[in-house]
């Protein structure tokens, strides 16, 4: 069963009408999304912008939605409608969500298992930027590397979203963290997130020289 939204209602969205340049996406009116019995309708108040969003617009991502579509993998907002089979959510709940695309819209419908409650002390902006950064780092460090307190973790691109999340997660496990960055400002940011040591890399270094610097300053047991 589909719960229909009143016809004529429109919402604003960033729309990719055909794969191509990022500059070709448009801000336009689209139909208010319907929901089925296992979906929730969310009024989006914040959305995360990530590298895969640029790839999907250009048709370079691992899957291609049917055009036109609205990009955006993650966001946060307020539940406005719930499907008849949805459990754990009600209208008015604060949530953050993960989706393949569609977050760059005023409203989105997602399966209720893709939405999660957002604490009152957590802003919509923070909730909307958590999945792609912390999710990526958690998968790499916890699910793949089996991180533990006796490991030393080397984080390349330490001052980026995924890098900062990696520092945060690694420190929560008691690991020693070395962050690699390109300037002092980024190094200071990594230290604020808990990095034990930072390495500032000169962009002019070739691959061999870079490897030697990392071995010397980070240590051979860094992962």
Question: Which role fits each region the language model picked out?
Answer:
Residues 1-11:
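Eukaryotic N-terminal low-complexity, Ser/Thr- and Lys/Arg-rich leader segments
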Residues 31-49, 60-102:
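Glycine-rich beta-strand-centered segment in the early N-terminal region that forms part
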Residues 55, 94-157:
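NAD(P)H dinucleotide-binding glycine-rich loop of Rossmann-like/cofactor-binding domains
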Residues 155, 171-223:
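Adenosine-nucleotide cofactor-binding segment
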Residues 159, 167:
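N-terminal Rossmann NAD(P)H-binding glycine-rich loop of SDR-like oxidoreductase domains
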Residues 164:
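Residues forming the Rossmann-fold NAD(P)(H) cofactor-binding site
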């Amino acid at each position: 069963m589909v719960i229909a939204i009143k016809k004529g209602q429109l919402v604003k969205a960033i729309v990719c009408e055909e794969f191509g340049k990022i500059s070709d996406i448009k801000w336009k009116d689209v139909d208010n999304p319907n929901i089925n019995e296992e979906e929730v309708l969310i009024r989006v108040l914040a959305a995360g912008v990530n590298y895969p969003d640029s790839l999907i617009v250009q048709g370079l991502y691992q899957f291609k939605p049917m055009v036109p579509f609205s990009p955006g993998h993650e966001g946060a907002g307020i539940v406005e409608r719930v499907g008849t089979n949805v459990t754990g959510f009600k209208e008015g709940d604060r949530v953050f969500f993960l989706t393949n695309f569609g977050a760059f819209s005023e409203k989105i419908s997602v399966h209720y298992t893709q939405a999660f409650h957002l604490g009152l002390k957590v802003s919509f902006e923070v909730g909307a930027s958590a999945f792609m950064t912390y999710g990526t780092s958690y998968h790499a460090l916890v699910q793949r590397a089996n991180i533990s307190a006796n490991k030393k973790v080397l984080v390349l691109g330490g001052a980026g979203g995924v890098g900062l999340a990696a520092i945060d997660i690694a420190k929560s496990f008691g690991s020693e963290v070395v962050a690699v960055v390109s300037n002092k400002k980024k190094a200071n940011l990594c230290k604020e997130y808990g990095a034990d040591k930072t390495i500032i890399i000169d962009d002019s270094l070739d691959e061999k020289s870079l490897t030697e610097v990392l071995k010397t300053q980070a240590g051979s047991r860094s992962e």
